[in-house]
């Protein structure tokens, strides 16, 4: 194990040294000495030296305003470099990569060794694999794109330096390049000056496709194919591509007034433009590669006399011209010009697939399989995975917006006020209108701007090429009418096909009612006819945890999924559960493999659809090699969950979970909702107010400008508590509930649940990870610097709760210390703490100075504001998850 870390440690210290030289060159010896002193104090403070901890606090409190920014930047940049080294380590031959693509091989061997599974059953499970990753622009991706590109290049240098056979001069060149990249990063402002627009966010998503996924997906499929051939003697069919990408960037308007129908239209065009751009590069390669002459009669008939001399090239050149014409038309549309559609405009994937596949079949038939299975096969797989739209988009809107639009319409028509009708009356009206042949919307009606926006969005969906929009997600869905309302609005827009509409159940009550809502819908004949045996339902992780605490939320999510699976199975409906997980624990994030195997049996039968958020996209798909390893992990987990489903929990375990859920929810809400000191404490002990100033995402931090915790979005709520290291949303209530059940004499049952029930062991594992990242002396320091003395007892109470929680979790898991079974993660947290701690101390100091100045009516000092932003970004990098 330790040799594995020594390679990582030596890279981290080498990058740290280069950063130190850069700082010295830029700002002089004295700043570097100051940074080094702080680093050494932090290291010995972590090792338990209290005198040095005190000295660390004093040193950071005494920094002048001029020293604040360089010190904050030094530690923040160091953490970015450490993350880069760690990301490289996960794919390097000396690190974990030695074992990663092995995931699929290990899974296949495990499945083959099960007497009850035939090879045929395993093949069928492989062929029904379906994985859809939904990229969302959560404001949690704090790092600017400029710096991400530099870090990708640092990664490439580390890879080359690992090569034992490089000559000395090459080694020196690489070290010079590393110094240049680190100097460039140092002299670049790491904080965005302006909030990104939704279009900027979409471009960030396209950059991930271009820089990583475009190469990563075909590589993953080659890996999968090799493992299948080796273990099952089975080859993947050419057209089989189990992975798809969808995006919320430019489509998610829930609580984001900046995402309008025009923006969605623009992003759809931009996405198609980017697809033509990437396919043109592919086809250019094929034009030069496919110079072969021999072809099948079918192919020769396709190209005619004109193309007989070089049939493959002829087809590729034709395709190239169509792509160029399509690109030119899209470019004009993006500039706002209205042009007639050109001859041969590409709008459907089949138009790309057919000529490419004709070449593939001919090459195979003429004994040139080795050529067919090269770049041509990769391009065919690009068509299946990305196609004409590149990434499809989801539209997401809050349910009340549809209700208000229909209310305005019914009032105008003089048939009453839809908003005040009972659920039964709403349903009767909607079903009647859905069955009606006449339009409902009057021609000369002038609706309000809000309603106009809802109708325009439906218009965009109706006009978009079929297949470019994946689903319409309704957030805060509560009733069957919420789903029927969207179907009616889409029908009125003239949509010519059945668009998947997915209700998102995201509060504790809504999760508990989800099965009832879906049962009612499935009992409506019109609805059953429309959905053609398929239904998507989205499960909200972050809002339910914010509403009820993690323990109650995770049990409600489990039960809702369990009930929906059984209901749909009984009704003969194929259910796709769409998981809205975040990167952080309070928003449902967990290591993929563990998370998938902890879901109810049968939950992955309809495939996996999951959101990949903000900074997690970069950690999981930032490089082609990491993409291969992330997709392999998902593949292994889905196969295992479908073929070796976890056992149904025992009735007594369900009863214990019900009990834990009630106790933890009461305690959580007792603090968050009912304790009058809680909101003032939260506002002062965390940088919550200051976070709103960060130009992070395009979406406001609050759903409504005023109000308490409930109006705050789940992301800033979690982000704020991660900054002050109390990590409160990810544990509050859970440990207390466990302690109560232990006191009732059920510890041995809890231990059995931990051993034999993946759902429960994953929950405890996630709590351990949160406790490993939390830090009570830092949380206490924030209180001392920032919180009114009258509120100190509340902070102390919360910290004591966490200490008790850690003890009970370790007792149930039978561990002597946190993260005992995941030493790699424990090591990674320890490595970063030395650099994150000074940023936390500094942040508390900066918040103190900034709030003090505000109290005294002074203008905020820009040096303090800038340094504060840097600490926020740095701590986010140190915690490896933000919101």
From Swiss-Prot:
Keyword vocabulary terms for this entry: Carbon dioxide fixation, Lyase, Magnesium
Q: Which Gene3D superfamilies match?
A: Phosphoenolpyruvate/pyruvate domain
Cofactor(s) this protein cannot do without: Mg(2+)
UniProt-listed InterPro entries: PEP_COase (IPR021135), PEP_COase_bac/pln-type (IPR022805), PEP_COase_Lys_AS (IPR018129), PEPCASE_His_AS (IPR033129), Pyrv/PenolPyrv_kinase-like_dom (IPR015813)
Q: For this protein, what reaction is catalysed?
A: oxaloacetate + phosphate = phosphoenolpyruvate + hydrogencarbonate
Q: Where is the active site?
A: 138, 546
Keyword Lyase applies = yes
What Pfam families does its record include? PEPcase (PF00311)
Output the Gene Ontology cellular-component terms: cytosol
**Is Transcription there in the keyword field?**
no
GO biological process assignments:
carbon fixation; oxaloacetate metabolic process; tricarboxylic acid cycle
- GO: which molecular function terms? magnesium ion binding; phosphoenolpyruvate carboxylase activity
TM annotation in the entry: none
- What EC number(s) are associated with this protein in UniProt? 4.1.1.31
> Which SUPFAM superfamilies does the UniProt record give?
Phosphoenolpyruvate/pyruvate domain
Assigned protein family: Belongs to the PEPCase type 1 family.
Q: What is the role of the protein in this entry?
A: Forms oxaloacetate, a four-carbon dicarboxylic acid source for the tricarboxylic acid cycle.
Q: What name does UniProt use for this protein?
A: Phosphoenolpyruvate carboxylase
Lineage at the top is:
Bacteria, Pseudomonadati, Pseudomonadota, Gammaproteobacteria, Enterobacterales
**Gene encoding this chain?**
ppc
């Amino acid at each position: 194990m330790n040799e594995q870390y020594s390679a990582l440690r030596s890279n981290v210290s080498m990058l740290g040294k280069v950063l130190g030289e850069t700082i010295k060159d830029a700002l002089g010896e004295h700043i570097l000495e100051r940074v080094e002193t702080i680093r050494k104090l932090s290291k010995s403070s972590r090792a338990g030296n209290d005198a040095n901890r005190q000295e660390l606090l004093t040193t950071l409190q005494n920094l002048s305003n001029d020293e604040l920014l360089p010190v904050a930047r030094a530690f923040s940049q160091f953490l970015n470099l450490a993350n880069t080294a760690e990301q490289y380590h996960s794919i390097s031959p000396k690190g974990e990569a030695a074992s990663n693509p092995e995931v699929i091989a290990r899974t296949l061997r495990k499945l083959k060794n099960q007497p009850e599974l035939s090879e045929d059953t395993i093949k069928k499970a492989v062929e029904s694999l379906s994985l859809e990753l939904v990229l969302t622009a959560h404001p949690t991706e704090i790092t600017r794109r400029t710096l991400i590109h530099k870090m990708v290049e640092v990664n490439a240098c580390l890879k080359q330096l690992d090569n034992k056979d490089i000559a000395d001069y090459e080694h020196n060149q690489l070290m010079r390049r590393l110094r240049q990249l680190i100097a460039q990063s140092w002299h670049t402002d790491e904080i965005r000056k302006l909030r990104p627009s939704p279009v900027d966010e979409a471009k960030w998503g396209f950059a991930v496709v271009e820089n990583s996924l475009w190469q990563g997906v075909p590589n993953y499929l080659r890996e999968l194919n090799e493992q299948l051939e080796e273990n099952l003697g089975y080859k993947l069919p050419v057209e089989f591509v189990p992975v798809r990408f969808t995006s919320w960037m430019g489509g998610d308007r829930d609580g984001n007034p900046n995402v309008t129908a025009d923006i969605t239209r623009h992003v759809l065009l931009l996405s198609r433009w980017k697809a033509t751009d990437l396919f043109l590069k592919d086809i250019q390669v094929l034009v030069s590669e496919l110079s072969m002459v021999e072809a099948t009669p079918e192919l020769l008939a396709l190209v005619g006399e004109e193309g007989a001399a070089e049939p493959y090239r002829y087809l590729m050149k034709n395709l190239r011209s169509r792509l160029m014409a399509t690109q030119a038309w899209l470019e004009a549309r993006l500039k706002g010009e209205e042009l007639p559609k050109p001859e041969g405009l590409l709008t459907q994937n089949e138009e790309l697939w057919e000529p490419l596949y004709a070449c593939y079949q001919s090459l195979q038939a003429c004994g040139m399989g080795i050529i067919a299975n090269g770049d041509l096969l990769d391009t065919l797989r690009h068509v299946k995975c990305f196609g004409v739209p590149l990434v499809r988009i989801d539209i997401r809107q809050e349910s009340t917006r549809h209700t208000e639009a229909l209310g305005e319409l019914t009032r105008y028509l003089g048939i009453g006020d839809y908003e005040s009708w009972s659920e039964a009356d709403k349903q009767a009206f909607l079903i009647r209108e859905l069955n009606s042949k006449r339009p409902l919307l009057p021609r000369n009606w002038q609706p309000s701007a809000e309603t106009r926006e809802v109708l325009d969005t439906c218009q965009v969906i109706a006009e978009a090429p079929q297949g470019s929009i994946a689903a319409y997600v309704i957030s805060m869905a509560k009733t069957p009418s919420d789903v029927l309302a969207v179907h009616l609005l889409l029908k009125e827009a003239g949509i010519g096909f059945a668009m998947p509409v997915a209700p998102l159940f995201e509060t504790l009550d809504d999760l508990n009612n989800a099965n009832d809502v879906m049962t009612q819908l499935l009992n409506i004949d019109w609805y059953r006819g429309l959905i053609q045996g398929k239904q998507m339902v989205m499960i909200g992780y972050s809002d339910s945890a914010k509403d009820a605490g993690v323990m109650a939320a995770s049990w409600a999510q489990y039960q809702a999924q369990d009930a929906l699976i059984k209901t749909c199975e009984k009704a003969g409906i194929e259910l796709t559960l769409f998981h809205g997980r975040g990167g952080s624990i309070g928003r449902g994030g967990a290591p993929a493999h563990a998370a998938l195997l902890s879901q109810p049996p049968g939950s992955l039968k309809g495939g996996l659809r999951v959101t990949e958020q903000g900074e997690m996209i970069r950690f999981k798909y930032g490089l082609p090699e990491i993409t291969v390893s992330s997709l392999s992990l998902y593949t292994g987990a889905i196969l295992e969950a479908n073929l070796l489903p976890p056992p149904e929990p025992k009735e007594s375990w369900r009863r214990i979970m019900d009990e834990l859920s009630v106790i933890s929810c009461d305690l959580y809400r007792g603090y968050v909702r009912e304790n009058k000191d809680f909101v003032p404490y939260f506002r002062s002990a965390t940088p919550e107010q200051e976070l709103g100033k960060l130009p992070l995402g395009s979406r406001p931090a609050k759903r409504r400008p005023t109000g308490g915790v409930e109006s705050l979005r789940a992301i800033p709520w979690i982000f704020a508590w991660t900054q002050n290291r109390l990590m409160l949303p990810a544990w509050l209530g859970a440990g207390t509930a466990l302690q109560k059940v232990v006191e009732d004499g059920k510890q041995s049952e809890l231990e059995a649940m931990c051993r034999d029930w993946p759902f429960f062991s994953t929950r405890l594992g996630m709590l351990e990870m949160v406790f490993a990242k939390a830090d009570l002396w830092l949380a206490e320091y924030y209180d001392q610097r920032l919180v009114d003395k009258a509120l100190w007892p509340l902070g102390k109470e919360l910290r004591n709760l966490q200490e008790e929680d850690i003890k009970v979790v370790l007792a149930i898991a039978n561990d002597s210390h946190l993260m005992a079974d995941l030493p790699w993660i424990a090591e990674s947290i320890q490595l970063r703490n030395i650099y994150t701690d000074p940023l936390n101390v500094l942040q508390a100091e900066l918040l103190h100075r900034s709030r003090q100045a505000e109290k005294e009516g002074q203008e905020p000092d820009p040096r303090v504001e800038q340094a504060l932003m840097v600490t926020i970004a740095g701590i986010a990098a140190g915690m490896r998850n933000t919101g």
